[in-house]
Amino acid sequence: AIAANQNRIPLAKMAVEETGMGVVEDKVIKNHYAAEYVYNKYKDVKTCGVLEQDDNYGIKKIAEPIGVIAAVIPTTNPTSTAIFKTLISLKTRNGIIISPHPRAKKSTIEAAKIVLEAAVKAGAPEGIISWIDVPSLELTNLLMQSADIILATGGPGMVKAAYSSGKPALGVGPGNTPAVIDETADIVLAVNSIIHSKTFDNGMICASEQSVIVSDKIYEQVRNEFMKRGCYLLNAEQTEKVRKTIIINGALNAKIVGQSAYTIAKLAGIDVDENIKILVGEVESVELSEEFAHEKLSPVLAMYKASSFDDALSKAYRLIEDGGLGHTSSLYINTVTEKEKIEKFYNTMKTCRVLINTPSSQGGIGDIYNFKLAPSLTLGCGSWGGNS
């Protein structure tokens, strides 16, 4: 963990240089989080041997390593995910074989090497951490079929392949996180939090907000706050241009992932200021036929108007059902006066993380906005998302 943390800056630079995605400063933070926060949380947790013993009832709870973990690493968070998965594997005495994304193999392997060298120096077996030097779909599938358990972080296709491998799998699929802003919400807090979350590493954390659903009673105020804070509200013609840039041939356009709002606007043929933070498209449909209703992994945000709280719930439910089952949902609301609405929200959302008045990128991964939520860069989606 110390070795990984000491290399957080060069690893961040390497990841951005290799992939052409994200923000160096934010990747430094992610690497630090993956090493420091995870170590501090789990260093004193017993993971093997006798975990519990009750002599009165004659019961012992014993944990054993699973064996070899297949770790699929995404191009969006290569070094931080590699650090996280190798550390938790070492902590549980499991071997791990990493399958990097072809676009991020150099930085992913470098992160794994740093952790391996430090682990071996500390007495771990040689080869406890391994990787595929020349990654391919065939080798990744072979690895998943051969391992004892799979930790799969990646696109829907990769996660589906992990679930179809015949081995236990913990998959991190698409997020498509909706953020509902209730009429009782603190508007400045809500908008600032969403911008803070959505711009972090150019929107590549899978828990980041993909859509914002706003009560019609405060819609104009929220709209104005976004503009005041440096976001760009697209007009109808510009919205159509960005639509054609988000989805290409039925899939997310890789050219927009982790790019700045200015770069994406240029790709769409729209002239905006270089310092624009987020491109906001005001749309109506939450169906998959609406490109803005998809997960975008970039500083592009869909904005919906809700006629009531139930309408907002219905829209959020549909967005999750189509593109983010089991992942994350977010609500901005007065927590003192609106307890019934909050209860209705978390009972309706089929997500493992329901965040209240919290930036979803930073809040979803734990130990930042809520210290009781364990830190993790693998945000599993539970039974809703098909996890084992």
Summary of predicted features, one role per range:
Residues 67-71, 87-88, 94-97, 127-130, ...:
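Structural motif
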Residues 1-15, 19-23, 112-123, 147-151, ...:
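Structural signal for hydrophobic packing residues in well-ordered secondary-structure cores
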Residues 1-2, 103-104, 132-133, 209-211, ...:
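Conserved short loop/turn motifs at secondary-structure junctions
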Residues 1-60, 88, 228:
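N-terminal Rossmann-like NAD(P)+-binding subdomain of aldehyde/semialdehyde dehydrogenases
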Residues 6, 10, 64, 84, ...:
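Conserved active-site and cofactor/substrate-binding residues in soluble primary-metabolism enzymes
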Residues 84, 91, 159-287:
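ALDH superfamily catalytic-core signature
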Residues 50-189:
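Rossmann-like NAD(P) dinucleotide-binding subdomain of oxidoreductase/dehydrogenase enzymes
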Residues 1, 270-388:
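Conserved C-terminal structural/oligomerization subdomain of aldehyde/semialdehyde dehydrogenase
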